Amino acid sequence: MNTLGLGLVKRLLSPIPLIVLAGVLALVALLGYGLASNKTKESSTSTLLNKVAPTPELPKLDGGGKSSLAAYKGKVVLLNYWASWCEPCRQEAPLLQRWQPTLEKAGGTVLGIDVLDVEGDARAFVRKYGLTYPILRDGNGDSQTAYGILAYPETFVIGRNGRVAAAVRGEVTDKFMRQSVLPLLEKSS
């Protein structure tokens, strides 16, 4: 083997390229885990389950003053945290809008909370998906802290009693709506 080939082999087997390769492989593994764990997960371990839901007052996205979860006392509320740049949020928006009339007829509502987003982008998102349910804006992330939000979307089902009845991390599905929301609507509608 010539000295050029031997030098290349020595450089490839030196610790630095091996460390870089190990780092890249670890990053790929973490990314894969993150994508796999971004699937919808009902959160039976949420620290808020069966507790009274926090009710921070936030500005309405449409500019019509402020509101909070307290304004929906006695209703079943699907409290959905989202952002316009969140791909899973884009995927679930049509489903949430499709369920809104059913919720309204039975004394409930979807209540969207746009978090850490550019206001113009959030408004464009609402227009694009034709969202008609109320949306509040958490520009600095305070309310997401109260709910322990880890990623978007994250959704909480608030019963008529103001307590968190269910939670889901990731996209809401029709199955989740049927199993976790409809029974609450039927209880005393």
Walk through the language-model features, giving the residues of each.
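Thiol/disulfide oxidoreductase modules built on the thioredoxin-like
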Residues: 124-132, 137-188
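Acidic helix N-cap motif at the loop->helix transition within catalytic regions
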Residues: 69, 120-123
